[in-house]
Amino acid sequence: MSCLTWNCRELGNLHTGRKLMEIVWAKDHSVVFLVETLTDEARLEFIQNIIIFYHRWVVSRVGKSGGLILYWRSSIYLTIKGSDKNYIDAVIDKDLESEWCLTGFYGEPETTRRNEAWDKLRSLSSRPERPWLCYGDFNEIIR
């Protein structure tokens, strides 16, 4: 299974949609998490159709910023556990035996609010022990 994350900085842009299609088709990704989609539901559905994914979970943008989407193929057994403006959290049960967690994360771009996003991530990390992949745009430089 291959997972892709991308801060696409406006999925409404034709060039961005075309590039996403090329990447997904070239690497045969199973799950795609996009941040800063900055677009409407109709465009997100259009993108879903051109990359040939059958499922999606959307967190709408707030004003003129943000927006998250998780696309996944029909062959993936994925259940959404929660979402908000900073994350989409899911459980994947690929072969009905080996359950694992997947969190697409978007760190707060506003520096004064970053602790809120990190607190959410800490809360998600405190679940019962099972493998966990957390990926995305953390908007943070780790030294």
Placement of each model-derived feature along the sequence:
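Short phosphate/oxyanion-binding micro-motifs
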Residues: 1-134, 141-142
